[in-house]
């Protein structure tokens, strides 16, 4: 029981927070804390909003006040020791709650996944895994994927070694620090289910995100065991010992070979910068800096700056530097759809941070609502309607309404500048390329010293940049914002599987494929996170996707232990069937629209980055591994202590093994 003075202070802090709280989330909290149907019925039913997470619920001020006052009383009762009335929600209850809160029907098939998220928010961990003594996993990378993987393996007692080529965790968020660098997913979704972000802004910037991954690594006890400054150059499968031999470059420049039973790649997809094929760029008479390799010492103040590209990184860096430079010229190779960003750099008020931190049920329910808004509801609007009469501009009626809404937004932002409006509105459907958020882009285009060139740069001569229309623009500095090589997965690690074939051979360089985005036929005991066709082109929580893949890998390892298996390899027929299915699904979706180019496709036109699945369908595929999808090899000799790796890491002679037929 809280002391009266402590309770009074707590009540005061919560009362400060509630005027800023999300009303639809408070309705969920009230129902869960009190069990009263009253809060899920008229007149408290929220109205669907067009943009954002609908903080007011579209309700009248007096109804909002009643909800906030009731929430204060319910939270104080809970804080004083009252039990949560609806602690264990049924699937039907949760779907009804979300349907009310989101102001639209939530399909019942989402119930299991949503309950799973709530359990994970509350601290549930995966089922135990028991593996033979000496069994080891190599985790390559300690970015957001690698940190999550290491935490789960440590929690389940699985022996692992983790290498990271940088000097810290964080992956791309540690490596990339160009001005304006941040996330375009709400921070409360861009967080592990098991670790709250305690964000200071709703859409955090690079430094806070990097700090988050560092903090989580420390809090969960994995940070001290990461081998920093260690790069995996090559990992090769040895078919005799059924182990992976990984050649590592150590911080002092020497090399070491590490032998493990399993390799789990967490190298990420935004590691290799993509440079434009621009004649004369290397001979530019001034600094040239890529956003992925930003030089904090580069001089910007008063300079004539040219930006090559107008994608996600350009849309962040341009507004961030515009007021510092003397002149800013942006070369736009293709036009982009840009959505409103009402919470751009909007701080989470300190009282709200207190509410998120001290009333975890509120944070869990808030995150659950966001996961529908950003993970799920967009997917249907990306499907091609074969009967739709305007396939050039949109793919269905919903997509056409989106086009109209985004067009109106752009016209409003650039009112009075028909010349700019004509330059920026795309001809292809919204969501055909990566959807961008307006963090001051249009406001920046209106500045008198900013020029938007409607076309790519053609060549560079001295300090002159020639556009494709032969117009010349002078610059002191070139910023290359052309993105990353996203279609060549697993780079820069060389992965060599069965029969000495590299993954680049199997994929014909950039024709990357994987079963469930996680395993590749011909590469036994090898798993990857954020593999081909796992990116969420329809928005959503990339981190939840990664956690789901980790659960799948753990399911495979669990069954390896239970069935005493030393080798699992995805069957070729399963692998091929899945990837045919992926491409068939993509042909019915917006990303195969012919009216635009996109980094989602490789050079031969196949979509290799994006997932065609609804998140709930992909989660169900990953929930439990089916070893019928694999060729497996059991361990026969029960006297063996390990599955291929002696404690000293020295290769032992091959054992008597038998292979289960595919």
Swiss-Prot record:
The keyword Cytoplasm does not apply. Residues 638-662 are annotated as: Disordered. GO terms for molecular function: monooxygenase activity. Pfam families: NAD_binding_8 (PF13450). The record marks 434 as: Transition state stabilizer. SUPFAM superfamilies: FAD/NAD(P)-binding domain. Its EC number is 1.14.13.-. The keyword Nucleotidyltransferase does not apply. Its cofactor is FAD. Keywords: FAD, Flavoprotein, Monooxygenase, NADP, Oxidoreductase, Plasmid. It is an enzyme of class 1 (oxidoreductase). FAD binds at residues 145, 164, 173, 184, 190. Belongs to the FAD-binding monooxygenase family. This is Uncharacterized monooxygenase y4iD. The lineage of its organism: Bacteria, Pseudomonadati, Pseudomonadota, Alphaproteobacteria, Hyphomicrobiales.
């Amino acid at each position: 029981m809280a002391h009266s003075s402590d309770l009074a202070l707590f009540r005061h802090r919560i009362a400060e927070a509630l005027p800023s709280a999300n009303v639809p989330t408070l309705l969920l909290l009230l129902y869960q804390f009190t069990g009263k149907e009253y809060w899920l019925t008229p007149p408290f039913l929220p109205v669907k909003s067009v943009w954002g997470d609908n903080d007011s619920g579209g309700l009248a001020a007096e109804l909002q006040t009643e909800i906030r006052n009731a929430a204060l009383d319910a939270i104080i009762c809970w804080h004083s020791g009252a039990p949560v009335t609806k602690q264990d929600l049924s699937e039907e209850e949760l779907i009804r709650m979300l349907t009310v809160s989101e102001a639209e029907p939530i399909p019942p098939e989402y119930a299991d996944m949503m309950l799973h998220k709530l359990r994970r928010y509350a601290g549930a961990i995966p089922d135990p895994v028991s593996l033979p003594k000496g069994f080891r996993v190599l985790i390559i990378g300690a970015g957001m994927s690698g940190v999550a993987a290491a935490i789960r393996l440590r929690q389940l007692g699985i022996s692992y070694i983790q290498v990271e080529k940088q000097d810290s965790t964080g992956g791309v968020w540690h490596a990339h620090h160009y001005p304006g660098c941040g996330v375009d997913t709400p921070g409360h979704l861009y967080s592990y289910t098991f670790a709250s972000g305690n964000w200071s802004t709703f859409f955090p910037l690079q430094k806070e995100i990097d700090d988050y991954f560092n903090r989580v690594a420390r809090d969960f006890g994995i940070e001290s065991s990461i081998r920093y400054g260690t790069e995996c150059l090559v990992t090769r499968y040895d078919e005799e010992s059924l182990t992976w031999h990984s050649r590592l470059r150590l911080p002092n420049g020497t090399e070491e070979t590490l032998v493990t039973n399993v390799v789990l790649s967490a190298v990420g997809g935004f590691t290799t910068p993509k440079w434009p094929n621009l004649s004369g760029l290397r001979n530019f008479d001034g600094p040239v800096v890529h956003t992925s390799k930003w030089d904090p010492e580069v001089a910007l103040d008063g300079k004539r700056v040219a930006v090559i590209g107008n994608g996600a990184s350009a849309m962040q860096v341009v507004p961030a530097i515009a007021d510092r430079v003397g002149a800013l010229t942006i070369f736009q190779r293709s036009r982009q759809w840009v959505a409103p960003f009402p919470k751009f750099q909007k701080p989470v008020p300190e009282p709200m941070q207190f509410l998120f931190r001290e009333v975890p049920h509120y944070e869990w329910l808030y995150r659950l609502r966001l996961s529908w808004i950003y993970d799920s509801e967009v997917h249907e609007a990306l499907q091609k309607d074969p009967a739709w009469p305007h396939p050039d501009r949109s793919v269905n009626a919903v997509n056409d309404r989106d086009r109209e809404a985004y067009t109106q937004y752009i016209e409003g932002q650039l009112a009075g500048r028909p010349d700019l409006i004509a330059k920026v509105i795309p001809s292809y459907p919204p969501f055909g390329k990566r959807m961008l958020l307006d963090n001051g882009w249009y406001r920046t285009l209106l500045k008198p010293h900013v020029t938007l060139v409607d076309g790519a740069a053609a060549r560079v001569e001295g300090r002159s940049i020639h556009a494709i229309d032969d117009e010349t623009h002078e610059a002191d500095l070139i910023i290359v914002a052309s993105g990353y090589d996203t279609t060549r997965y697993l780079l820069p690690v060389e992965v060599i599987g069965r029969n000495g074939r590299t993954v680049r051979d199997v994929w014909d360089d950039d024709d990357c494929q994987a079963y469930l985005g996680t395993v590749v036929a011909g590469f036994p005991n090898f798993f990857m996170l954020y593999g081909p066709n796992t990116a969420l082109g329809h928005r959503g929580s990339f981190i939840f996707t990664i956690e789901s893949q980790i659960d799948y890998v753990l399911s495979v390892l669990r069954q390896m232990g239970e069935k005493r298996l030393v080798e699992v390899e995805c069957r070729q027929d399963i692998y091929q069937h899945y990837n045919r299915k992926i491409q068939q699904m993509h042909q019915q979706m917006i990303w195969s629209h012919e009216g635009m180019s996109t980094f989602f496709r490789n050079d031969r036109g196949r979509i290799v980055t994006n997932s065609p699945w609804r998140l709930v369908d992909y989660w169900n595929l990953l929930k439990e591994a089916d070893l019928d999808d694999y060729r497996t090899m059991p361990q026969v000799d029960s006297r063996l202590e390990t599955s291929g790796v002696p404690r000293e890491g020295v290769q032992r002679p091959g054992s008597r093994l038998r292979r289960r037929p595919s």
